[in-house]
Amino acid sequence: MRFFIALEIPSENLPQFQSIQTSLHTLIPQSKITNLDKIHLTLAFIGEQPDQLKDQLIQIIQTAVSGISSFEVTPAYIDGFPNLHHPQVLWIGVKGDIDKLLLIREGIKDGLESLALPVDERRFVPHITIAKFNNHFAINRGLEVDLEKLMVISFDPIKISSIKLFESVPEEGFHKHNSLAEISLKS
């Protein structure tokens, strides 16, 4: 299975992402918009691993969230990887209870390392991918200003009450995300 651990964005928050994506696609028609049913905030991409690892991954998540109560993050700014001027990915960064998010991420990272699984060592930037580009795309200063204007809407906070283990399944040139387990945070 191809595993990843993420925060699923609640359905009540999705219309605001859809609004941003619609405006984004108008500004940059060649952008490949992320399907709303795939909108999430990844905490760890684990990749292809044996199916029997599932129970150990669930245990890692349970340990990482132990004692952590529900919290909120709010979409706040737009950026890109590797950078906003030549993005392969456009994403929305979040603000709010980032300390809790980072604490969970570190717990997951420690658990993955204890199983000798590869862990992304780059600085963790909590983000929600909204679009991708197939080719090298350049964003000039004018377009950058237009993208920043997309974020002037007042986003509703996203209530984080659980962490999910997903599998990513190739399907007709895309990947379908199936939820394998949901681990609730403390109420």
How would you describe each model-predicted region?
Residues 1-187:
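Histidine-dependent nucleotide/RNA phosphoesterase domain, centered on the 2H-phosphoesterase fold
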